[in-house]
A protein has these predicted regions:
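Flexible, processing/modification-adjacent segments and terminal tails
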Residues: 23-30, 89-163, 183-187, 239-240
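A general structural signal for short secondary-structure boundary/capping elements
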Residues: 64-66, 92-99, 112-113, 122-124, ...
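Gly/Pro-enriched, hydrophobic low-complexity segments
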Residues: 143-239
Length: 240
């Protein structure tokens, strides 16, 4: 069970950006996403980042380049057996890919992508997700309070349907803390972490450090090598 947790990494998510964007969106989700650069996301040609996990005395890193306009994904990391793996694929053609890509790489990509840009996903997914503003609540850490915005996904479809993300949002509309509740029976059932280490790359804002617990065990998720490439440019803009 622990090995599965480390390989699939903490969270399961139902869909990826690009679905149902023309439908009605949650106003509170839009307000949060705008703080992270939603209005300028159309300028972004590619996003680069390395997902780093520290859990149960083990460290895992996965590097990605994602082109949101085309759905092209490039992965540099290891497979479940620890062997080096590099692959590039189109999400629209996922059915053509090997089992390793379909069963390991793409679920990991979706997971890591939600960690790095969840404020956008909460907005993009809001036509199908139940987004509720629950007002000011005490932070799970017990220190201070913030607005609680709950994002609950449908019990049907996706890698792990029925998940709920509780976002604790400050007065500046930045997420300060979040609690993830898994909808199914897979582990972990509960992940609770900070959102800190804020950096900006071009027009986008990223939280690059998350510290907390996964089913009670200490966990840290961090991002390095974060950068964006804007349309019409060949240069990467590093987060700082």
């Amino acid at each position: 069970m622990l090995s599965r947790l480390i390989v699939l990494v903490l969270l399961g998510v139902p869909v990826l950006a690009g679905t149902s964007r023309s439908q009605m969106h949650s106003p509170i989700a839009e307000q949060i996403a705008k703080t992270y650069g939603l209005d300028s996301f159309g300028q972004v040609e590619a996003v680069r980042y390395t997902f780093n996990l520290e859990l149960a005395g083990k460290n895992i890193s996965r590097s990605w380049v994602w082109e949101p306009k085309t759905g092209r994904v490039s992965f540099d990391g290891k497979d479940k057996d620890g062997k080096p793996l590099k692959v590039t694929y189109l999400q629209s053609d996922l059915y053509k890919e090997s089992d390793v890509v379909k069963d390991e790489v793409d679920p990991a990509f979706v997971n890591d992508n939600y960690w790095i840009i969840f404020p956008f996903h909460a907005y993009w997914d809001s036509p199908g997700a139940d987004v509720q503003d629950k007002g000011m609540q005490q932070l799970p850490s017990g220190k201070g309070s913030a607005k609680l915005v709950s994002v609950k996904y449908s019990s049907k479809g996706g890698y792990t349907p029925g998940d709920t993300w509780d976002l604790y949002v400050g007065n500046d509309n930045r997420i300060e803390y979040f609690v993830y509740h898994r909808g199914g029976e897979k582990k972990p059932q509960l992940v609770s972490t900070t959102w800190e280490g804020y950096k900006k790359a071009g027009p986008l804002l990223f939280s690059t450090d998350h510290r907390g617990t996964a089913d009670g065990a200490p966990v840290r998720v961090s991002f390095s090598n974060v950068a964006v490439k804007l349309a019409g440019s060949d240069s990467w803009i590093d987060a700082q």
